[in-house]
Amino acid sequence: MSSVAIIAASGVGKRMNLRNGLSKQFLEIGGYPVIYHTLAAFQRASSIDKIYIATKPDSIATLETLAEEHQFSKINAIIAGGKERQDSISNCIELIALHIEKAEIDRPDTILVHDGARPFITPDEIDQIAQLSHHYGACVPATKPKDTIKYISDQPGFFGETLDRSLLLQVQTPQGFASEKLVEAHRKAREAESYATDDAALVEKFFPDQKIKVFEMGYHNIKITTPEDIFLGEAIYAQLQQQS
């Protein structure tokens, strides 16, 4: 089985209140940039053959230097992302297709799409998701919500119905898919000018018969989004270091 990873690392970190265009992926946890931890996990995952990264144009050189310094040999391309996250993933998919056509890489069985700002995914979890994606055609990691979730009422400032928490999961990444399904879903989305919140939603829309396997995760695989996440991330990093 062969797998390719796409890392979405174009986020500008608006909720981080960062200045001077700094990307949240370059904030440090444990003395290393967030994106370093992410890439290190995929570099060590035995299921991953190649890594493609979509980032801001002014971050490409920084990531190229990072890859060289830490010998992230699986990184095959670092390219400019698009206007939306989905556009960034599509850019990578088109490049992967071109590399396959030119026989520069073998056609992967699965493609995994991951948020660059989720630094605590482990190589073993990546490998398990890749295997399940290959077996079922699609696999998405998720956690059970800790908090009660409610609809917002039609009347501003008031709650509506309370959702049954036992029927809900909070979706994460990496999301894995049979490569032909993900490529075709993005092609159809481009043609229809259709956008979705994540790749699983695209596959659900264009391949409604494709069931998506749940990979239940722990609560360590957080996305660095707000300033508080840095402090939480330091604690998670310390715990993972003790376990390794």
Swiss-Prot record:
Pathway connected to this protein: Isoprenoid biosynthesis; isopentenyl diphosphate biosynthesis via DXP pathway; isopentenyl diphosphate from 1-deoxy-D-xylulose 5-phosphate: step 2/6
Protein name: 2-C-methyl-D-erythritol 4-phosphate cytidylyltransferase
GO molecular function term, any single one: 2-C-methyl-D-erythritol 4-phosphate cytidylyltransferase activity
NCBIfam families for this protein: ispD
Cross-referenced InterPro entries: IspD, IspD/TarI, IspD/TarI_cytidylyltransf_bact, ISPD_synthase_CS, Nucleotide-diphossugar_trans
Residues annotated as site: Positions MEP for the nucleophilic attack: R165, K223
Enzyme class, spelled out: transferase
Enzyme Commission number, as recorded: 2.7.7.60
PANTHER family with a match to the protein in the record: 2-C-METHYL-D-ERYTHRITOL 4-PHOSPHATE CYTIDYLYLTRANSFERASE, CHLOROPLASTIC
A Pfam family matched in the record: IspD
This protein's UniProt keywords: Isoprene biosynthesis, Nucleotidyltransferase, Transferase
Stored SUPFAM superfamilies: Nucleotide-diphospho-sugar transferases (SSF53448)
Function, in words: Catalyzes the formation of 4-diphosphocytidyl-2-C-methyl-D-erythritol from CTP and 2-C-methyl-D-erythritol 4-phosphate (MEP).
Protein family: Belongs to the IspD/TarI cytidylyltransferase family. IspD subfamily.
Reactions catalysed according to its record: 2-C-methyl-D-erythritol 4-phosphate + CTP + H(+) = 4-CDP-2-C-methyl-D-erythritol + diphosphate
Annotated GO biological process: isopentenyl diphosphate biosynthetic process, methylerythritol 4-phosphate pathway
Site positions (Transition state stabilizer): R15, K24
